Amino acid sequence: IDLIGSVTAEVIERSRVPVLAIPENTPFKQFSEAKRIAFITNFDQRDLIAFDSLINNLKSFKFSVSLIHLSDVQNTWNEIKLAGIKEYFQKQYPQLEIYYDVVKNDNLLSSLDSYIKSNHIDIMTLTSYKRNIFSRLFNPGIARKMIFHSDTPLLVIYGRPN
């Protein structure tokens, strides 16, 4: 599984098109099965562009989206920013159900896993900014665990430079 994980991580890091990484034993067959998609944001402008791309590419499917920000501390400003992003996209896509949450980043893998389970998330989505996709959002070891030791598919969208 390590070799497969390494190859998948390399594909994700080098790709300039969206990549859907599906863990080996995940019973995921098609996008129409996905009812809840989580989108991790770091409040970067490229996240908003990637979110727009996600919605436009999947507009023929029926699903809801949870905007997630990972934070070490409880910060009201993060909630305000997420609420603003939700409001902006709710106007752009009135038919789309959008939620938002700040996930405490004290134990990333455990926190995300708990969030995924309690919110019935079918796909985790994040934006890659540079060649090294995980350097800004995650500790590489945790990211590898998240991708390859999770049953949740991961959709990575390349964030075009501003």
List the model feature ranges, each with a label:
Residues Y99-D106:
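Short beta->alpha junction loops
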